[in-house]
């Protein structure tokens, strides 16, 4: 770990420093004025109002050639690609009658659920009121109406059977008008969750609001029970408008704390009252110590695949289970367990990848690290040891979209060697050897270098959504020939709006330092002149498995800072970031807060060498993990930064969630990694903030990175008698996302930076 040296000033040095400070204060403000252009610069108001936001188009597939889409006037429209038929399946007046903001069509197309009264809970979860509309009769279903608010609701894959979660218990309806059947009875607020994840699983493992899955034929329903009874509670005040604040309590396991106890059950929904839920056994090698459930995939109507992780998270076990009619139980034989282990870090990327099963319901494709440490697609038929590697190279496969009888569609960053690009590829798996084709590499090449896709069930048709670097565009394609059929959304209105705007120039390049290569994105002011000197703002996230340097379009706060204020912005992907191989990724394993910071400092020095950066006007800012890195960079004692901002920063990994902290740091125990947990805190660097201007920001109702983190930083700075600025946002969560708070936040940060850089208002 880097040694943090304390600088001692003598009397002469102090006098010289005082003189420098006086000179800086007296220096006149600077105004950035792009010349020779009649276009206007972006304004902060443009950003806060979302004036230049873009649209995407994702079809809601209901068959191989049919999909639904919600129009701009909120009609739900049916489309048939082959017949070119389109019509309104549900009118906006019906939507408005219950103030619906979302919908879901039953697979038999007889009913639609309408979602209203959306109330956000955590990152993915929310509650809502649901109404069922009968399309054939043109009226809402009356009798045995759904309770409110519901935590999650979904249709079965066939017919119009539905399951929902209410007050942490799961209920089943065979038809929308039927009385509900209660499947679970153990649900209790903040203690036992059925069919929905608790806080830590939602945020750090599943990344969903649900934890239940229908079998393909709708016969079985699998669900997870999370028991949080023994988990410590995080409590914080929500001030509201009342005389007394109320207390929010969340079971929240921090590093080293007791974790949720998870059990997976499957219930036969055809006769749920005859045979209750059946528990699926945990693999022995996992059950012998603390473990996590990581995902569930239905393979066929009577075969299911479960994934488990050891608490240390370097060993993952994939277990394939079959329904035994004679036992009326689920059997998970040991010879159907596949183990994935990392010897250099943690298993998988941010999450362990999920399998994409073949038509035979036995073999599957999965992304994991090859012998060279790059994540690639492998074909597993019997054991992981005998896996056949499908892709290879010093790049990474990102995601498998679809596996059909003769094709596999996936995304990667292979093309032209840019880690921050995404293209869609097709592998013809019926051929020997398999042949590979890049579907998107040469489509609108200048405009589109970062794609995702949405496929119909058997990939007969698919939509491509390009996110940049030019204006986003969504297109429909034939899955057999890859030919473009139709442009779904091309953002023409946005294109016209931007014609009179001075946008900055964006460059994505790489810099080398010793044997390391760092990719960076630099946003340069309009009419950029290399012979001049510009202030520099580093925007950092830097967390493990993250990526900031991406070829995507954006008009946001940093775009404004470059366009209007003449600030050069740089984003750098240092060690620990994703999609450049395990050696680069796992460099930060068990030592967070070291290389992420060092690599930002290295990049700043390289940028100064380019000749157009004003060394006296360099700042850094970040949010969440980025707030942690920006804080440590400011306290590095290098003198590179004049000022910086940390929004909702982690300040100690002992304060953060067990699943996340332990994945990258191990356990905070003496016989594991307690020493680095203690050494890597922001508080340990409090003395080194003396010579920088530091703005610390946090929401008081942050359920993710608790306000405790910033409170401890502030306490350490006060104890060290270090001056700093702070801003808190009452009742705001991790995103500080309410309109007025967000406006205040970005206005305040802008004023801080302009003062730091001596820029005129």
UniProtKB/Swiss-Prot annotation:
E.C. number: 3.4.21.26, 3.4.14.5, 3.4.21.-
Activation/inhibition comment: Gelatinase activity is inhibited by serine-protease inhibitors, such as phenylmethylsulfonyl fluoride (PMSF), 4-(2-aminoethyl)-benzenesulfonyl fluoride hydrochloride (AEBSF), 4-amidino phenylsulfonyl fluoride (APSF) and diisopropyl fluorophosphate (DFP), N-ethylmaleimide (NEM) and phenylmethylsulfonyl fluoride (PMSF). Dipeptidyl peptidase activity is inhibited by 2,2'-azino-bis(3-ethylbenzthiazoline-6-sulfonic acid), diisopropylfluorophosphate (DFP).
Keyword Zinc on entry: no
Keyword field: Angiogenesis, Apoptosis, Cell adhesion, Cell junction, Cell membrane, Cell projection, Cleavage on pair of basic residues, Disulfide bond, Glycoprotein, Hydrolase, Membrane, Protease, Secreted, Serine protease, Signal-anchor, Transmembrane, Transmembrane helix
Reactions this protein catalyses: Hydrolysis of Pro-|-Xaa >> Ala-|-Xaa in oligopeptides; Release of an N-terminal dipeptide, Xaa-Yaa-|-Zaa-, from a polypeptide, preferentially when Yaa is Pro, provided Zaa is neither Pro nor hydroxyproline
Entries under InterPro entries matching the protein: AB_hydrolase_fold (IPR029058), Pept_S9_AS (IPR002471), Peptidase_S9_cat (IPR001375), Peptidase_S9B_N (IPR002469), Serine_Prot_S9B/DPPIV (IPR050278)
Phylogenetic classification of the source organism: Eukaryota, Metazoa, Chordata, Craniata, Vertebrata
Annotated active site: 624 (charge relay system), 702 (charge relay system), 734 (charge relay system)
GO molecular function, one term: dipeptidyl-peptidase activity
Sequence ranges on the Cytoplasmic membrane side: 1-4
One Gene Ontology cellular component: anchoring junction
Protein name: Prolyl endopeptidase FAP
UniProt keyword annotation of DNA repair present: no
SUPFAM superfamilies in alphabetical order: alpha/beta-Hydrolases, DPP6 N-terminal domain-like
Known partners and oligomeric status: Homodimer; homodimerization is required for activity of both plasma membrane and soluble forms. The monomer is inactive. Heterodimer with DPP4. Interacts with PLAUR; the interaction occurs at the cell surface of invadopodia membranes. Interacts with ITGB1. Interacts with ITGA3. Associates with integrin alpha-3/beta-1; the association occurs in a collagen-dependent manner at the cell surface of invadopodia membranes.
Site residues (Cleavage), renumbered to this chain: 23-24
Described purpose of this protein according to its UniProt entry: Cell surface glycoprotein serine protease that participates in extracellular matrix degradation and involved in many cellular processes including tissue remodeling, fibrosis, wound healing, inflammation and tumor growth. Both plasma membrane and soluble forms exhibit post-proline cleaving endopeptidase activity, with a marked preference for Ala/Ser-Gly-Pro-Ser/Asn/Ala consensus sequences, on substrate such as alpha-2-antiplasmin SERPINF2 and SPRY2.
Disulfide bonds: 321-332, 438-441, 448-466, 643-756
